């Protein structure tokens, strides 16, 4: 009588499969941590944010302090600073001084505050306004043509030229700069949101909501708005990087933040005069500007790849 020998279950294969499944990222936060672009861009941007917040503590001297006898000093120059009580303390100009004797290091640190505030404010305002317009334009058909013609007209004008034109109409200041930069960014958000709405408007679950008498605002909030969150987060990073660059360009051209305010653009505008002799006045703010824009763009690329449902499906 023959007997059938049962093969033992392949615990090793099951264990390996379980381990592989356990090692895969399962939540959006795990997906973000598994993306090197998100980690790199986020880390650099976090350092820049901390630098901006801690500028009063990290700076060696008041950025507006003028000392003509110490003008155009090379990086690493040391000197004694006289305080209000008459005492003196040693300080080091880590990035040298400009043509008025102001500390470049302190001015660059304080300049990061302006750049990051402008970038974040423009991104938030552009997304808020563009989202509202895009939702209405994409869902209400008779408004779509009117809205898109206005958006096409705005996009036909180069953003930097439109920003300069808007700056010429108002007094210079950070609020005016934010307004002048965020207006040209609105069409980009509107077109993105409108495209998402058009792709969702004919979905069965939206038609079902319409058939049971759901109001248009409720449909937009409940069914359409959630689908725009991930693309808008990614778009917001690109708008932030663009706004930081445009603010620096406006200040560099002398039509942005007032010259006495320490911004990266203003510092570079002053440093270009003696760039061939004292390059540090332009070099250091330029490095901070380039690194910040690079970090924001890399973060945006990482978020785009991570929040893409197709990639999330492959990784999960």
Each predicted region: which residue ranges?
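Residue-level recognition of transmembrane alpha-helices
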Residues: 45, 107, 148, 152, ...
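Generic hydrophobic transmembrane alpha-helix motif, especially the helices
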Residues: 94, 120, 124-203, 207, ...
């Amino acid at each position: 009588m023959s007997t059938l020998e049962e093969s033992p279950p392949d615990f090793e294969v099951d264990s390996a499969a379980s381990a592989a499944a356990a090692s895969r990222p399962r939540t959006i936060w795990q997906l973000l941590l598994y993306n090197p672009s998100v980690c790199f861009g986020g880390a650099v941007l976090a350092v820049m944010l901390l630098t901006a917040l801690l500028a009063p503590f990290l700076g060696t001297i008041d950025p507006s302090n003028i000392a003509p006898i110490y003008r155009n000093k090379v990086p690493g120059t040391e000197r004694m600073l006289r305080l209000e009580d008459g005492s003196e303390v040693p300080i080091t100009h880590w990035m040298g001084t400009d043509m008025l004797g102001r500390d470049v290091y302190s001015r660059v640190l304080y300049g990061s505050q302006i750049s990051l505030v402008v970038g974040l404010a423009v991104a938030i305002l552009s997304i808020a306004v563009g989202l509202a317009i895009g939702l209405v334009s994409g869902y209400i058909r008779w408004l779509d043509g009117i809205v898109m013609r206005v958006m096409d007209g705005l996009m036909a004008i180069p953003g930097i030229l439109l920003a300069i034109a808007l700056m010429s109409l108002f007094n210079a200041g950070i609020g005016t700069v934010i307004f002048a930069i965020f207006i040209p960014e609105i069409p980009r958000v509107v077109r993105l949101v409108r495209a998402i709405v058009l792709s969702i408007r004919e979905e069965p679950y939206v038609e079902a909501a319409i058939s049971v008498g759901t109001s248009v605002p409720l449909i937009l909030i409940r069914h359409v708005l959630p689908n725009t969150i991930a693309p808008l987060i990614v778009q917001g990073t690109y708008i932030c990087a663009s706004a930081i660059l445009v603010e620096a360009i406006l200040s560099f051209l002398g039509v942005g933040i007032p010259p006495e305010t320490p911004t990266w653009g203003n510092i570079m505008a002053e440093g270009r005069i003696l760039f061939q002799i004292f390059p540090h006045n332009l070099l250091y703010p330029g490095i901070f500007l380039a690194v910040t824009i690079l970090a924001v763009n890399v973060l945006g690329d990482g978020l785009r790849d991570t929040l893409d449902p197709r990639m999330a499906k492959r990784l999960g």
